[in-house]
Structure formats: structure tokens, C-alpha cells
Design a protein with these regions (language model features):
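Short, solvent-exposed loop/turn positions at domain surfaces
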Residues: 1, 83-84, 154, 193
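Non-catalytic DNA-recognition/assembly elements of restriction-modification systems
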Residues: 2-48, 167, 171-179, 186-215
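Alpha-helix initiation and N-capping motif
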Residues: 7, 14-15, 34, 53, ...
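Short coil/turn segments at secondary-structure boundaries
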Residues: 30-33, 50-58, 151-152
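Sequence-specific dsDNA recognition surfaces
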Residues: 38-49, 58-92
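Hydrophobic residues in beta-strands and at strand termini
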Residues: 62, 109-110, 125, 170-172
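A short beta-sheet element
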Residues: 86-88, 92-145, 161-162
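A short glycine-rich beta-alpha junction/loop motif
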Residues: 100, 114-121, 153-179
Length: 215
């Protein structure tokens, strides 16, 4: 329980650092230039049906993206999932954004290549003015959620389209500052990994003891 609390606190630390460095996006308290989506990123519609070529690549369905944190869990390969429909190609340069039920806030940062469900968009930040980690955190923020949820409330199955994402604008701080924030997030992620590993070790020990005494 304590370790789970530690993980939650580390997530809060990142959010607090975001506001500290970039201000409140809603009021744009630091007076950054407001920039349109297509000036700092693009939706990369590079799709494939070549399942032989990508057979051993990871296949990311939207169920593999944890809500809120964007952690990638429980995914399998393209071959294991028996993929039959067109999928988007992504790389470690992309953000994977689930366009279904945007209130679940599924924004992932893959560190590998693979294919993702057509229910998600691979988003490619413009490296000249936008850091990938910064953009992912901006997309997980209330600022982006408040914008995107106004469209999805109209349907039974809430879904976001390209046009709606393309209509998004946000304050864009200097790239050097975004990069500083990104370095901070990476350091926190390393700490999270350490906590996560100790959680998994504890779980294994618990199972072994249960087996020994009650198996």
C-alpha cells in the first residue's frame, strides 16, 4: 500500500512541476504564445496491413494503455493477437492517443516500434518546437481534457476525430524549457520503475509464501 502511495505521489510531483515551470495553461499565466496543433505536432496516419513484416512487433490495443498514467501493459505481438484489420505504425518518436472515450485520458509514450489499433492516433511532435514528453503531459492535463470532452459528450460511444484534435491550441513554452521538464520526468520515471519492481518482488514473495503454507 505504501509503495502504491509512493507511485501516486511521484505522479503528483510531475503534475506540480509542470504547473511550476509552465504556469496555469487555462489563464496562460506565464504569457506564452498560443500555438495551433498543426504547428507543433501532426497525426501520423501511416497505416499497414503487412502482418507478415510486423508479425513479431508489439501490437498496442487501447485496452493496453492504462488510463491517466499512459503505462503500456499486457500487450502481445501482432501475430499473437491474430491482427486482420489495418493498423497504424508507431515508433519511439510518437505519442499513442486513444480516441475512444477520451475521458479515460489514455496517452502513451512508447519506447519501442510497433503497430497500434485504429482506435488510437499516433501523434508525432515537431522536434523543432515541441518535446514529446512535454506534449504527452499537456495532453493528460485538464486543459486538453476540457477542450476535447466538449466534442465527445454528444454521442453514445464518445470518440474524438482528427479535425477536433487539429482544432486544439495551447501555450507553447520555449523548447529548452520543455527539454528541462522532460529530463525531470525521466528521472521521476526511473524512481517509479524502482518502486514498481519492488512491488512486483513483494507480490512474488507473497505468492510463494501462500503456496508454501496453503498450497
Amino acid at each position: 500500500f505504501l509503495r502504491k502511495q509512493q507511485l501516486a505521489k511521484l505522479d503528483e510531483l510531475v503534475k506540480a512541476r509542470f504547473v511550476e515551470m509552465f504556469g496555469d495553461f487555462k489563464s496562460n499565466s506565464k504569457g506564452w504564445s498560443i500555438v495551433k496543433f498543426d504547428e507543433f505536432a501532426q497525426i501520423d496516419g501511416n497505416m499497414t496491413t503487412d502482418y507478415k513484416k510486423y508479425a513479431d512487433y508489439p501490437h498496442i490495443g487501447i485496452d493496453s494503455i492504462e488510463k491517466g498514467t499512459g503505462a503500456l501493459k499486457g500487450y502481445r505481438t501482432v501475430k499473437e493477437d491474430g491482427v486482420v484489420s489495418g493498423k497504424y505504425i508507431f515508433t519511439p518518436q510518437h505519442i499513442i492517443y486513444s480516441k475512444i472515450r477520451p475521458n479515460l485520458n489514455k496517452v502513451a509514450l512508447p519506447d519501442f516500434e510497433g503497430l497500434c489499433s485504429a482506435d488510437a492516433y499516433p501523434i508525432l511532435p515537431n522536434p523543432k518546437n515541441c518535446n514529446r514528453i512535454f506534449l504527452a503531459l499537456a495532453m493528460r492535463s485538464d486543459y486538453f481534457l476540457d477542450y476535447i470532452l466538449q466534442f465527445s459528450a454528444r454521442t453514445n460511444l464518445p470518440k474524438v476525430n482528427r479535425k477536433e484534435i487539429a482544432g486544439f491550441s495551447m501555450p507553447l513554452p520555449p523548447l529548452s524549457l520543455q527539454n528541462d521538464f522532460s529530463t525531470f520526468v525521466e528521472r521521476v520515471d526511473q524512481q517509479k520503475q524502482t518502486v514498481q519492481q519492488s512491488l512486483e518482488k513483494l507480490e512474488l514473495m507473497k505468492k510463494a509464501l501462500m503456496q508454501e503454507y496453503f498450497g
